[in-house]
């Protein structure tokens, strides 16, 4: 008498395993997309806050002892007292100490000069107002469900 001792899985068992793996992968992709969206939003908020703090601290240094605005020892800097236009030109130029990248467009700089229009997501647009001695920082943060606008105004005096 022959015994048929087949070892292995049936087609149904294999299909069930493939279906389970597919369902888990679908859940993982959705969770990962949510994670990356939240990371971009948090990174953009952090970049906005860091730029505002950097400019405010450099302006405070200017008011104390009239040191050049910018990184110590840099060839390109702004002499104090600085006008909003010269500060924004310096910070958005090639020699800018601000090296952050836009989280939504990885190779683009996170800081740019603006004239008051809408800001593309992830980009901190600095708008100088020489008559009011202020710099306005505008940043747009968005995901699939909402769009938030951050705006901060600091005085250069």
Which positions does each model-derived feature cover?
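Amphipathic alpha-helical segments typified by the pilin-like N-terminal helix
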Residues: 2-50
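Periplasmic/extracellular, small/polar-rich flexible segments of pilin-like filament-forming proteins
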Residues: 57-157
